[in-house]
Amino acid sequence: MTVTLTINSQRVTVAQGSTILEAARSAGVSIPTLCHHRDLSNVGACRMCVVSVENARGLQTACTTPVADGMAVNTESQEAREARRFVLEMLLSDHPNDCLTCEVNGECELQDLAYECGVTWPEQRGARHAYEVNPDPNPFIFIDRNKCVLCGRCVRACGEVQNRDVWNFASRGFKSKLVAGADQFMLDAGCESCGQCAGYCPVGALYDKMSLGVARANKVKKVRTTCSYCGVGCSFDLNVRDGKIVRVTSASDAPANGMALCVKGRYGYDYVHHPDRLTRPLVRAKWLDATQRDGRLASGEWQAATVAGKHARRSAVSGQQSAVSSQPSAIRDQEPVPGLQSPDRFIQVDWDSALDLVARRFAEVKREHGSEAFSVFASAKCTNEENYLFNKFTRQVLGTNNIDHCARL
């Protein structure tokens, strides 16, 4: 069933059970909101969406009031505009005036609403909160209760999206504040450090601790990608500055996960730029020695590669030009990696050399021990196409059915 109403003298037809806010947005009419989010339940906490409804007593919150047939709504009445300005002035009167250094400057919803409604910073009106900034030892989530506008988004996100119910409000009136559990540290209250609360916070009262002081929204390029940690296929936006990932933000239109991310997906990106990350193939020295029998490396070239690699590292430290540049690329790429003793030390090689070695060893094992000597594990981190090819390679090339799949590999 449908319902027909008028919004600012515009005739609108929507499904029965819709709210005034949903009806207005379907008609292209903008109503300011602060506590509302399309993924969460509506509570009407901020009172920014108040509108005038004909024959109704007082102003109505558009996000919680259901439409009715024949209803007449005015979103821009003098009474509604004055009420919104008053709400904004009250919020700003107890809000830190640190926009110049705030992490969410430029993407703060309170800032946007003040601009939209023409509200400037009000004069001091009574007491102000002075909470300790970032008192919680959680390694991923930063909290500044002085910025909190008590919209309740984090409370609903934690309960409705993550099903943890870590956040809630304590006390009443001016003393109302956001607390974890029974006013505990987040982790003591059962927090999973998923960061949903920070993702839904409109003002930066909750923020990603790893991204503090790194880059603002207008300084980063957002790149949509898929999480590599498991097979769910969560999508999110990498916030990239100067070729480096500085933050991960949720993508509300992600098909598998929406705004939801786990702690690994949201905060486990530092491995990308970690110095220990392997970016080139490593082969044990004993296998490179074996290739000499096939004439791949001439006699003495392995020793030459070792000496060249050591000299390259010394030259890099002293700033001198490396003598390794005069070596052929096949030898220059085989720079010994320190930390292991020959013959088990790892050597950096080019991809062709590594793949040739693997193919040759596979052929030797199959010839000497048969196909049943192979055991293969696929991974949920691979795409369906990659796993299909892996399965085909195992059965048709290696000639074995010993293939399994691990969701956490």
Model segments located where?
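N-terminal cofactor/phosphate-binding cores enriched in small/glycine residues
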Residues: S9-D69, Q78-A83
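N-terminal export/assembly segments and adjacent metallocofactor-ligating motifs
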Residues: T2-T13, G17, V53-N55, G70-G319, ...
